[in-house]
Amino acid sequence: MAELSEEALLSVLPTIRVPKAGDRVHKDECAFSFDTPESEGGLYICMNTFLGFGKQYVERHFNKTGQRVYLHLRRTRRPKEEDTSAGTGDPPRKKPTRLAIGVEGGFDLTEDKFEFDEDVKIVILPDYLEIARDGLGGLPDIVRDRVTSAVEALLSADSASRKQEVQAWDGEVRQVSKHAFNLKQLDNPARIPPCGWKCSKCDMRENLWLNLTDGSILCGRRYFDGSGGNNHAVEHYRETGYPLAVKLGTITPDGADVYSYDEDDMVLDPSLAEHLSHFGIDMLKMQKTDKTMTELEIDMNQRIGEWELIQESGVPLKPLFGPGYTGIRNLGNSCYLNSVVQVLFSIPDFQRKYVDKLEKIFQNAPTDPTQDFSTQVAKLGHGLLSGEYSKPALESGDGEQVPEQKEVQDGIAPRMFKALIGKGHPEFSTNRQQDAQEFFLHLINMVERNCRSSENPNEVFRFLVEEKIKCLATEKVKYTQRVDYIMQLPVPMDAALNKEELLEYEEKKRQAEEEKVPLPELVRAQVPFSSCLEAYGAPEQVDDFWSTALQAKSVAVKTTRFASFPDYLVIQIKKFTFGLDWVPKKLDVSIEMPEELDISQLRGTGLQPGEEELPDIAPPLVTPDEPKGSLGFYGNEDEDSFCSPHFSSPTSPMLDESVIIQLVEMGFPMDACRKAVYYTGNSGAEAAMNWVMSHMDDPDFANPLILPGSSGPGSTSAAADPPPEDCVTTIVSMGFSRDQALKALRATNNSLERAVDWIFSHIDDLDAEAAMDISEGRSAAESISESVPVGPKVRDGPGKYQLFAFISHMGTSTMCGHYVCHIKKEGRWVIYNDQKVCASEKPPKDLGYIYFYQRVVS
């Protein structure tokens, strides 16, 4: 490179900007690749736009924008000089002390074992004229000051990726207890010794809790595996109502573990020193002698059997490197994202759409490619498939490998993709753990929005569902079709093969709890896959069905079949459900999924000879005997508590009152409960509850339900507001006509997500309207030429499949735990566990959560 002259620097001086507080500085990662300052060519940061580019792409930005001056940042890593453990020569590995990722004391998945030598230069394109950061001394003061200010501001500014991380996930963020400042403490308490404690009701000498009201020392709860305590502390609370207890052995001058039985959570007690002194305990003199609850939970998570099996822990696995074997760094509970995109980019359609067309996508990228969906997805796909980032982690720039990291690769960190895909979303924009199935559907939706009328890789998953409803009173039927992307497979626990073992386990567990002894070894239910498939296809009774043949309520049965079979069948095992108390829980179940799958028997047949269709008559919107002014519930006029001006019209819908009452009693807002029942079509409490759980974070969650053509509070009809053009375009890109898109949006108060649901559930009505258009004087040719065929494009073929990939979840809830995926590549199973990519020795196919089957083509 030639040396930068004063004249050259003066020529670009007007384009050099000093970043301000609101500017996004992309100094960690290239906008088009995963090159970083540690890459061989370093990173070039535009000193005008503050976008970062690798050596391969910096000229692309120069040619597109004309920006010539860049800050070239290059870092070389070297091992940190640390104290070594005695006799081993290895640095001591820090043990996590917090149930968190990415915060001090938490799980550090990218532990910083290195220090960096940094080389900073100013470079002017296209000739790559350069001057070192410390070589500005000979320039005129005004030039030197301007350039130095810009350079220092760039180097000291928080990077865009850091700003986008709203917060690192912390599973032990604790709130101040409501009892902390007014806790009642009994007079004349016993003095508590500084050590030698024992439960006052049994012989336990660990996991002991001091009640801060009366000074009782009692053992803690029993854990699911039988360890822990004998529940004496919680039993004492039930008897006395004394709410706060501190765990003995965790008290230090910095604090202690405090639990509130009333609030059922770990809490903070700002008055802890005062509360302890009441019993003669000097907090400043105490030392830690027992594990904190966080440490115990971390230990439990790391040794629980499900985690061991799914991650294939304890088995030496061969690391894999090269194209298609690139790991993804965990950005703080982003394993759900990592698992989903690894599977998607193992599918040829996604490779063709984004990776094969990489150059075209990059050429058409806007000035700021970090905000372009197609660019960031193409960048992600190339990063995973190119092999450029799938190499063993290196110790330094000389290429020496790190011995203790030989099974780990640097991989890629998709920060820009995560920020863009989660932008504006109440959940995916955070660093909290998420449901992989929900993220899969969110990503599918984003692909739909951005593909418009171009090639759409989502077609590999899309299929039509045929639903048949049969009125039992008249034997007449109605067929409808809807689009779906996932087959949700129920788990019939009553079909478990080891019922006797399960009953025996439950009895032993009950006896152990009564006798306060360790619990027996866990027994996992073994449910045949065939039983799950039978449950999916089994008829479902529909009570209070409005029969258009009877013009009255009747009982019907609904059966679900496939109207088409997709190229790739996605099966979600419905492991996550709600208990009788509506608390989310995960079924601990083993289902031996078949390698070869044939679901041909689930293909729908459509209207059969001899079947008579139900009349296509819209049901009345209120029952004939319903009092005027009611909400349209199946109820009576005594339900005054449910009255609302928004539902006083005689055109109010019929809503199942019992379901609404159930949801309201669980603490959800009345208006949200009404919407849940309305948008799920009175299909029962479970469907309404699922709607509530998936829409809780919507900005309008608790807003009143405004029906199509009705007026909201203080507003005109929803139809008066024209649907947003971008929403119309999105629906049109999915294969519907503009008129259909407008109608769907108006019917759902201009909500894009609900409009898509609405249009899929009204395909038959849209077909009828299209036919009516023709019968009213429009020729078939005119109709075809002026509108797009109804419904999105689906592929169809035989219903025979082969298992291709599966995503597994470890933990008790989708809101916590960890995800990994297994993918079959080149005839072998491969496990993708964030950055670690290895050949799988024993893929746990019976414990998966989401399965991906590929059609077998004969």
Swiss-Prot record:
> Can you locate the Glycyl lysine isopeptide (Lys-Gly) (interchain with G-Cter in SUMO) cross-link?
113
**GO biological process, alphabetically ordered:** negative regulation of ubiquitin-dependent protein catabolic process; positive regulation of proteasomal ubiquitin-dependent protein catabolic process; protein K48-linked deubiquitination; proteolysis; regulation protein catabolic process at presynapse
Q: Which UniProt keywords apply?
A: Acetylation, Cytoplasm, Disulfide bond, Hydrolase, Isopeptide bond, Metal-binding, Nucleus, Phosphoprotein, Protease, Repeat, Thiol protease, Ubl conjugation, Ubl conjugation pathway, Zinc, Zinc-finger
Q: Give the signal peptide as a residue range, or say none if absent.
A: none
The region called Disordered is annotated at 73-98
Q: Where does substrate bind?
A: 209, 221-224, 259, 261, 264
Effect of loss of the gene: Conditional knockout of usp5 in T-cells increases the production of effector cytokines and retards tumor growth.
Domain called USP: residue spans: 326-856
ZnF bounds (UBP-type): 175-283
Amino acids binding Zn(2+)? 199, 202, 219, 232
Query: Which subcellular locations apply to this protein?
Result: Cytoplasm; Cytoplasm, Stress granule; Nucleus
- The intrachain disulfides are 195-816
Query: What EC number(s) does this enzyme carry?
Result: 3.4.19.12
What protein name is recorded for this chain?
Answer: Ubiquitin carboxyl-terminal hydrolase 5
Q: Which organism is it from?
A: Mus musculus (Mouse)
Q: What is the lineage of its organism?
A: Eukaryota, Metazoa, Chordata, Craniata, Vertebrata
